[in-house]
């Protein structure tokens, strides 16, 4: 579960390393976001000469959470970190690569491009 002020790792090659959630999109009083939800982030750490800079505000989709997610068959899946992938205005990924595993729930949330770029889908 991601809420405002949560720090996340950026799991793509846009150049950002660490981001902070500043808004959970989808309702005025919505507090938490889970895998497949869109949030607004601010980049806190970035590598030099990259497409995103420190202080950039952009939208992102959550691909991994430390909080477990229950699936229909009764199994639970959780990850070691909270991670997101930066999106452009058309809600497609800005980077060309996605690092680390991503959850299968992204397929249900219609982020097929992120799923196809990922090296592993769990």
Curated annotation (Swiss-Prot):
GO MF term set: large ribosomal subunit rRNA binding; structural constituent of ribosome
One biological process term in Gene Ontology: translation
Family recorded in the similarity comment: Belongs to the universal ribosomal protein uL14 family.
Function: Binds to 23S rRNA. Forms part of two intersubunit bridges in the 70S ribosome.
HAMAP family listed in its UniProt record: Ribosomal_uL14
Keyword RNA-binding: yes
GO CC terms: cytosolic large ribosomal subunit
Subunit structure: Part of the 50S ribosomal subunit. Forms a cluster with proteins L3 and L19. In the 70S ribosome, L14 and L19 interact and together make contacts with the 16S rRNA in bridges B5 and B8.
Entry-linked InterPro entries: Ribosomal_uL14, Ribosomal_uL14_bac-type, Ribosomal_uL14_CS, Ribosomal_uL14_sf
Protein's name according to its UniProt entry: Large ribosomal subunit protein uL14
PANTHER family, sorted: 50S/60S RIBOSOMAL PROTEIN L14/L23, LARGE RIBOSOMAL SUBUNIT PROTEIN UL14M
Keywords: Ribonucleoprotein, Ribosomal protein, RNA-binding, rRNA-binding
One Pfam short name: Ribosomal_L14
Gene3D superfamilies, alphabetized: Ribosomal protein L14
SUPFAM superfamilies attached to this UniProt entry: Ribosomal protein L14
